[in-house]
Each structure stands twice: as structure tokens, then as C-alpha cells.
Amino acid sequence: GIDVPEKYGGSEMTKTGMCILAEGISFCGSPSFCTVWNVQTSIGSLGIIWYGNDEQKKKWLPGICSGEKIAAFGLTEPEAGSDATNSKTTGVLSDDGKHYIVNGQKIFISNGAWADTFIVALKIDGKFSSIVIEKGTPGFDIGKEEKKMGMEGSSTVPLYFTDCKVPVENLLGNVGDGAGPAFCGLNIGRFKLGASAIGGMMLGMQHAVEYAKSRKAFGQSISDFGSIQDKLATSAILTYTLDSTCYSVIGKQTEAINELDKNDPEYYVKQGNTTEQYIAENSIVKVYGSEAAEELIDHCFQIYGGYGFIEEYPMAQAYRDNRINKIWEGTNEINRMLCGRAMITKALSGEIGFKEYLEKVDVYCNNGLDSGYEGDLKTEVECVEAAKAVYAICLNESLSKHGQDIGTEQVIIENLANILIYAYVGDSTLSRVIQNKDLYVQKNQVVPELCAKVYTAEQGIRVMEYANKILNSIYDGEIPKELESKFAKLS
């Protein structure tokens, strides 16, 4: 009940508290339990918290909060995965107006075999809607447990609806309001996935460090070898940068929520809608978190050598369990599309002052970067500012070439998202290090600053690679000299 109001049995924890809890639960070492918890506290219940009426909240939330009831979420279908609004599951109002007759199928439903309540996306009168269906409802059948390569302690099943009679009072909001319960919950689910990765990454590093210290080769601990130290250093950088990004993102969302009036009858609806403003940021956390965890696990696996491949050691399970994180809560490809398109929308609407920033970029290219920061990390700050400038140039060139059709240019959108991810992670990390510099000096902690320096240096090179892919796509390999000159000044 971390997001549930106290009156319905929850704790209504702060969003920062939620992030800390996600990190702590994942450090316990059971990704399957993290999955159950994440579904229970995000996609399985947020739709009710934010968009349910008082009677619906009283009926379902106390049991979900106490754990007496398990929650699940039904969105994916055999013919509607990433294109979720293409749902073939339908609800038709009964002749007496008391029920929706639901027909259709859902697949890959986490918590499905155990759940008591299911938030189900469907079409009613051709309009995308969300409804709560309870276990045991006539016409509702739960399929067999899927045999998975990982997350074996979690439940994943198909759901079948055959003339399933669901009371009309189970509809969340009105007919056609399905996007809120479905996608706003997914936004927070994506964030929690990234936040949960932090604890798992810390645990993986702990295992790898302990093993490296104890494992002897050539008469010494393998932790003394440069190649092993490089893997551990990279793992530390990945963990610190993800941690910085998560708390930066949740801090911004908390600020937006704090501006809402708690006495407003629509407070929780508006809180849910607030997540729409942070689609890009939550997608960044999900993509970077799942991919950072994957890279870290691979390094830790390698440190274990042959033992990494043996099930009684910790890295084999971690390797299997993590793979799904790049797929569920929206594939990383889709999240890159969401991230890229969200920023394009903000640029075209004038929300982020894109035209004004382009003028600033021209000044950068003529007179050099000026971040306004004069501290020890000036080079790193300017590296991130250069990445932002490169992003702006690439976005402007993409819009000039493709106009309103830019949304269909997936290679361009994906690489724009890659630049944006680097810039956001780099900015979050540097902001944290600069803000806490006195504390780090006092405690003689040098690792945070080193993490920031290495991350910005390595990713800065990749930014130019992403930019070249974008411009080569636009100009068929013949990039104008003017743009090459701009990039040379920013690189």
C-alpha cells in the first residue's frame, strides 16, 4: 500500500520512500518477489488508486494493501503487444445494462495464477477502456503457468474471457478512459523497474567482490588483476549513475505532485495524470536501468569464471532473471520510441523552448561552450552540455527532413533517445556530485567524482556515434560540411 491513502489501508509513502523501498527489496536477492511486489504496487493497483471511485477503492484497496488480495494487470494480447490500444478484447453492455459481456484473451500476465483482482484493458463501443475483473467471475478462466527461462518464482499465465459478465460498476472512470489506468500505471511501473535494478546491481557487485577477493590465481587474489578491477569499476559507475538518475527523476515528479491541492476531489486523478508529463524520464530510467543491470551482471558473471555458469552460484540466476527486464513494462525499443516522441512533442509545442535553445547552440558553435559552471568538473559539465547541443542539432535536422512523419523514423528516434539518455544520466550524476561535493570531501569519498568523470568521457564518444548515425540516415552518407564543422566544435 505504498501509494494507497491511509483511509483505504495504505501508507501513502513519499515517492522517494517508494524508490528506497524498491531498491531495498531488490537487494534481498529475489527478482521474482520484486516482480510480484512491483505488479502489486504499480500496474495492479495504481489504476484503482488514481482513477477508481470511492466505492471501488473501499472494495479492493484494503485487501491489496494487506496482501490478503493479489493484484494483476491484463494488457498484452496475442495480436496487441507494444501496440496495446489495438486490443481485441471487447466489452458489450448487456441488455439489462447491469453488466459488460467481456470476450477476449490476455497473455504474459504477471501474478495471474495467484491474483484476486485484475485491471483489464479492453474496447467498449470501440473505445479503449479499463475494467476490474475479479477471480471467479463466470466466463473468466486462468490458463496454465508458462515455463520461463527466468523469474521462475513469479507467475505468468494467459487469461481467457468467454461471455464473462462483469458488473458495470467495475469500470474505471468512463468508457474511453482506459489510457489513464493502463498507461499511467505503466509509467510508474517502468520507474520501479529501474529503481529495483539498483539493489540487484549492488548485490551482484557484493557477490563479485567477495568472490574476486577469495579466488586465487597465479599466487594472488584475482581482485588484484587490472582486468577484474576494470569490470568492478565499470559496475560501480553503472550503479552510481543509475542511482543518481532514479532519484533525480522521482524528485522532479514529487515536486509536480506537491503542487497539487490534496483537498481537490480530483487530486488522485491529477496525480495519475501528472505521470504523463514524465513519460520520457520514466522510460529513461527503465531503459538505462535494465541495460545497466545487464552489463553489470555480465561483468560479475565473467568474474566468477566457470562458476558463473553453475546454478548453485548466484550469477546464473541473475543472468536469466534480468533478461526479461528489457522486454516487459514495454520493450526497450518501444520505450526509446516513447522517450524520443515525447521530447519531439515538447519541442514542437514550445514547452521546452526548443527554438530559443537552437539559437544558444549557434552561439556555442561560434564562441565555444559556456555552461556557467567554473568548478572542478567544468570539463565534464561542458561534455554533457555538448551532448544536449548535439541532440538539438540532430532533432532540428530530423524535423527539417521528415516533418510530422519523424515519428515513423524508428532508427532516428532510437538514436535521438540514446543521446537523450546519456545527457540525462550524465546531468543527473554531475548534479549529484556537485551538490554533495563538500560532503564527499569531508568523508574522503573520491569514487562519486571518478564515476562522473569516467561516465561523461566514455559516453561523450558514443554521443557522436549516435549523431553520425542520425545524420547519415538523413543525408544518405553525405553530411553537409556546415554540420560537420558544428560537431567538430562540440566534440
Regions picked out by a protein language model, each given a short descriptive name:
Residues 2-58, 62, 66-67, 110-114, ...:
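Internal helix-loop-helix
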Residues 79-82, 108-111, 123, 148-155:
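Short Gly/Pro-enriched turn/cap motifs at secondary-structure boundaries
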Residues 89-93:
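A structural signal for short hydrophobic beta-strand segments in well-ordered beta-sheet cores
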Residues 98-142:
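A short core secondary-structure module
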Residues 109, 151, 272-363, 451-491:
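Alpha-helix capping/hinge segments and adjacent helical runs
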Residues 141-243, 283, 324-328, 332-337, ...:
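Glycine-rich beta->alpha junctions and the first turn(s) of the following alpha-helix
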Residues 209-210, 231-270, 417-438:
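Loop-to-helix element that buttresses phosphate recognition and phosphoryl-transfer chemistry
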Residues 364-491:
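C-terminal amphipathic alpha-helical interaction region
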